[in-house]
């Protein structure tokens, strides 16, 4: 890849380890603007024009078989259009990446809520060696851009993500992303729907993708544009995804949380059986068996969680060593 600007060394701290990066200017020709859409005829033209006005002419619209004129308008405004073969935003993104022939992707929604003027600052960290950038909508959000229920749900999900997966990405549900194609190829993504942003964040943690957050503007949807998001249903799916994805990223939490619940339930039932037997002379043999099973299951799940966490930690350490050796080898070439 040719350099389009001067290189210089920058240093940042990552988890107490000093990491050095080559700094370079990323040219617009190296970037594909990816816009997943579904029935966005009211806004897609202005979104495409906004990115093109800022020099990003390589725009790929991946459309979920819209019933309106989204595709026609996108073509009229100079974008390439891909009709996804499956359903859901996650599947659309995975399929679209197969048609990207440049090293960097800038992803946004086609509803006009994200500002194309933020494109340069989204891409700037990639020039410093980061592999994935998340745009933080809460840094500069219009007052009417998010309903109160949606805002509460977003903050709850971000806190749950920090607690379960141990990283603070500020706004994991943001659809404004910039990333390298190489880092995307390392991620194991299965989500088809709106849980794709959650899965991206979890996979960045699990795979050790160098990720940072930048502030972006977030505006309200135009009145003529309708959202495809269902807050209760999709919010529930996202919470379940956070827990499910902990299986391979934080197995101690995944198995331990169920183990603690089973253990406490078993102890509670055992206490009830003991009190009834001592003070009332009533024996509950079946409940005693249930209590013993709950305690045994809880202990086993906790032990399994600890062992799984040790394996995951060892795997991460081996991966870091391999990546360090690879970097040193490439540096000497």
Predicted features and spans:
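N-proximal low-complexity "stem/linker" segments adjacent to membrane-targeting elements
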Residues: 1-50
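Membrane-embedded multi-pass helical conduit in multi-pass membrane proteins
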Residues: 251-333
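Catalytic beta-strand/loop signature of glycosyltransferases that borders the donor
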Residues: 170, 210-218
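Acidic metal-phosphate-binding loop of nucleotide-sugar-dependent transferases
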Residues: 112-113
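A conserved acidic beta->alpha catalytic loop
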Residues: 63-71
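Acceptor/aglycone-binding surface of glycosyltransferases and processive sugar-polymer synthases
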Residues: 84-99, 104, 116-194, 198, ...
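Donor nucleotide-sugar binding loop of glycosyltransferases
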Residues: 40-43, 66, 89
């Amino acid at each position: 890849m040719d350099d389009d600007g001067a290189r210089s060394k920058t240093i940042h701290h990552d988890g107490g380890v000093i990491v050095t990066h080559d700094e370079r200017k990323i040219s617009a020709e190296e970037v594909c603007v990816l816009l997943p859409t579904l029935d966005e005829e009211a806004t897609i033209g202005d979104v495409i024009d906004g990115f093109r006005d800022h020099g990003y002419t390589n725009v790929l619209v991946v459309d979920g078989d819209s019933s309106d004129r989204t595709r026609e308008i996108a073509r009229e405004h100079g974008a390439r259009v891909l009709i996804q073969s499956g359903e859901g935003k996650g599947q659309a993104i995975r399929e679209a990446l197969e048609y990207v022939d440049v090293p960097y992707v800038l992803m946004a929604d086609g509803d006009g809520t994200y500002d194309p003027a933020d494109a340069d600052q989204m891409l700037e960290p990639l020039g410093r060696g980061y592999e994935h950038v998340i745009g933080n909508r809460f840094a500069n959000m219009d007052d009417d851009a998010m309903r109160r229920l949606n805002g509460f749900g977003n903050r709850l999900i971000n806190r749950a993500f920090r607690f379960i997966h141990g990283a603070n990405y500020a706004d994991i549900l943001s659809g404004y992303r910039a990333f390298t194609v190489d880092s995307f190829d390392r991620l194991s993504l299965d989500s088809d729907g709106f849980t794709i942003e959650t899965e991206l964040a979890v996979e960045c943690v699990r795979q050790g993708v160098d990720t940072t957050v930048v502030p972006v503007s977030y505006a309200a949807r135009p009145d003529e544009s309708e959202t495809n998001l269902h807050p209760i249903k999709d919010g529930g799916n996202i919470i379940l995804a956070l827990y499910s994805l902990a299986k391979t990223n934080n197995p101690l939490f995944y198995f331990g949380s169920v183990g603690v619940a089973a253990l406490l339930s078993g102890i509670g039932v055992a206490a009830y059986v003991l009190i009834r037997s001592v003070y009332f002379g009533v024996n509950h043999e079946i409940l005693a068996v249930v209590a013993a099973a709950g305690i045994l299951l809880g202990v086993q799940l906790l032990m399994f969680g600890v062992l799984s966490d040790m394996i995951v930690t060892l795997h991460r350490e081996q991966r870091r060593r391999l990546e360090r050796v690879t970097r040193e080898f490439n540096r000497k070439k």
